[in-house]
Swiss-Prot record:
Entries under InterPro entries matching the protein: GMPP_N, Man1P_GuaTrfase/Man6P_Isoase, Man6P_isomerase-2_C, ManC/GMP-like_b-helix, Mannose-6P_isomerase_type2, NTP_transferase_dom, Nucleotide-diphossugar_trans, RmlC-like_jellyroll
Family classification: Belongs to the mannose-6-phosphate isomerase type 2 family.
Stated name of the protein: Mannose-1-phosphate guanylyltransferase
Note: There are two duplicated genes for manB and manC in this E.coli strain.
GO molecular function annotation: GTP binding; mannose-1-phosphate guanylyltransferase (GTP) activity
Organism lineage string: Bacteria, Pseudomonadati, Pseudomonadota, Gammaproteobacteria, Enterobacterales
Catalytic activity, EC: 2.7.7.13
Keywords carried by this UniProt record: GTP-binding, Lipopolysaccharide biosynthesis, Nucleotide-binding, Nucleotidyltransferase, Transferase
Function (record text): Involved in GDP-mannose biosynthesis which serves as the activated sugar nucleotide precursor for mannose residues in cell surface polysaccharides. This enzyme participates in synthesis of the LPS O9 antigen.
Provenance organism: Escherichia coli
Gene3D superfamilies recorded: Jelly Rolls, Spore Coat Polysaccharide Biosynthesis Protein SpsA, Chain A
Pathways per UniProt: Nucleotide-sugar biosynthesis; GDP-alpha-D-mannose biosynthesis; GDP-alpha-D-mannose from alpha-D-mannose 1-phosphate (GTP route): step 1/1; Bacterial outer membrane biogenesis; LPS O-antigen biosynthesis
NCBIfam families: GMP_PMI
Length: 471
């Protein structure tokens, strides 16, 4: 059986304003009801696989857990990176964790933010790769190119491993992102693939090759795994150890150096959705080439991508535009300038704006909070607590809170006194009071929260007890 290893790090800044640091693109529902992470996992349906192992930023742990829970795939195989160190260390953490008890699984390493529309062809490529990975090869999947793309690295294939029609090829070399002329030559030659960043190999084989070529990375990752907190829900990698690990991609660290690399071609309508333009390319369009998502309307417009979170967006007489409207930001740009979105994100960071980092709607392990009004002296939040969810038992030094129940039933604790509130009832939480809100019901609990005080920062949450381990 295969062990899917899903790399779910990254911030996806080129898909701002929908993708933010605390809610990056792999968790977005850009196509249908599933997020890109969820699609990556459900795409494996029909193959013999273990429960997936997911590697993510520790700030995204509850997002990952909730999205896995929605698929009934939640397990304790969520590895939390305290800091990003690129793909070679991330895969090493997964391989070390997978071999802790003597096992040596076939690891299928996938990115959480790819689109692969032809699932049968993808499965066929996996079955081919499985045979050769089982024999000790390190398999990379090369995307059959259909354009002289300058945004991807390339893999040049060498000699065929066998004479069968579905043979993999030895890897001749990895090539950095080319200019347009060289990309055209690569496409015409028929000898090059796009580098997908997807792999398959035995866990111990990867570790042995890493030991040959980058023992410093292996040593740092081994120390981090040895000191990890293997809690009931997550595998927490210690910051003080892992931050010393070198930052290196698996291509540079292992795949370019090993003698055992082979490439399996994949022609399955793949995209890494690295920009709004790429998303327009792979999305269903109307007769004028427009992609409309959410509350959007167009007239005499062509080849536009319009995505509106909640406001109506009407576009008249425009073409080749990307218009993305969220609750707190609007992006308007020429579709050919998709790579410049990062400049907007850099501007927001430099000016200490919060829009690069988080949405107005913030996700918590107990549910979500929509910031309706935010001022220096008071905030108004619409809170949704999922069934069984609960705030931590906490207190604040500088703010009081008013809770009004909009729907459902809440169990409130204030300074040891416990009581129930139902729709249209309210309560007051004084400054310094120990308090907690729980949802004992089977439907979501909706609450209007008004915070008021001299300081409203998140660091004025003093947690006393928490069922999610945040104390």
């Amino acid at each position: 059986m295969l062990l899917p290893v899903i790399m779910a790090g990254g911030t996806g800044s080129r898909l701002w304003p929908m993708s933010r640091e605390l809610y990056p693109k792999q968790f977005l529902r850009l196509f249908g009801q599933n997020s890109m992470l969820q699609e990556t996992i459900t795409r494996l349906s029909g193959l013999e696989v273990h429960e997936p192992m997911v590697i993510c930023n520790e700030e995204h742990r509850f997002l990952v857990a909730e999205q896995l829970r929605q698929l009934n795939k939640l397990s304790s195989n969520i590895i939390l990176e305290p800091v990003g160190r690129n793909t070679a260390p991330a895969i090493a953490l997964a391989a070390l964790q997978a071999t802790r008890h003597g096992d040596d699984p076939l690891m299928l390493v996938l990115a959480a933010d790819h689109i692969i529309n032809n699932q049968p062809v993808f499965h066929d490529a996996i079955r081919v790769a499985e045979q050769y990975a089982d024999e000790g090869h390190l398999v990379t999947f090369g995307i059959v190119p259909n354009a002289p793309e300058t945004g991807y690295g390339y893999i040049q294939r060498g000699v065929a491993v066998t004479d069968s029609a579905h043979t993999p090829y030895q890897v001749a070399r990895f090539v950095e992102k080319p200019d347009r002329e060289r990309a055209g030559a690569y496409l015409a030659s028929g000898e090059y693939y796009w580098n997908s960043g997807m792999f398959m190999f035995r866990a111990k084989k990867y570790l042995s090759e890493l030991a040959k070529f980058r023992p410093d990375i292996l040593e740092a990752c081994q120390a981090a795994v040895n000191a990890a907190d293997n809690g009931s829900d997550f595998i927490s990698i210690p910051h003080d150890i892992f931050c010393e690990c070198p930052d290196e991609s698996v291509d540079y660290a292992v795949m370019e150096k090993t003698a055992d690399a082979v490439v399996v071609g994949l022609d399955a309508d793949w995209s890494d959705v690295g920009s709004w333009s790429a998303l327009w390319e792979v999305s269903p369009k109307d007769g004028q080439g427009n992609v409309l998502s959410g509350d959007a309307w167009v007239h005499n417009s062509e080849n536009c991508y319009i995505n509106s979170d909640e406001k109506l967006v009407a576009a008249i007489g425009v073409e080749n535009l990307v218009i993305v409207s969220t609750k707190d930001a609007v992006l308007v740009m020429n579709r050919e300038r998709s790579q410049d979105v990062k400049k907007a994100v850099e501007f927001l960071k430099q000016n200490q704006r919060t829009e690069y980092k988080r949405h107005r709607e913030i996700y918590r392990p107990w549910g979500r909070c929509d910031v309706v009004v935010q001022t220096p002296r008071f905030n108004v939040n619409r809170i949704t607590v999922k069934p069984g969810g609960a705030f931590s038992m906490q207190m604040h030094h500088h703010r009081a809170e008013h809770w009004v129940i909009l729907a459902g039933t809440g169990q409130v604790t204030v300074n040891g006194k416990q009581f129930l509130l139902s729709e249209n009832q309210s309560t007051f939480i004084p400054i310094g009071a120990e308090h907690c809100l729980e949802n004992p019901g089977c439907i979501p609990l909706e609450v209007l929260e008004i915070q008021s005080g001299s300081y409203l920062g998140e660091d004025d949450i003093i947690r006393i007890k928490d069922q999610y381990g945040r104390c």
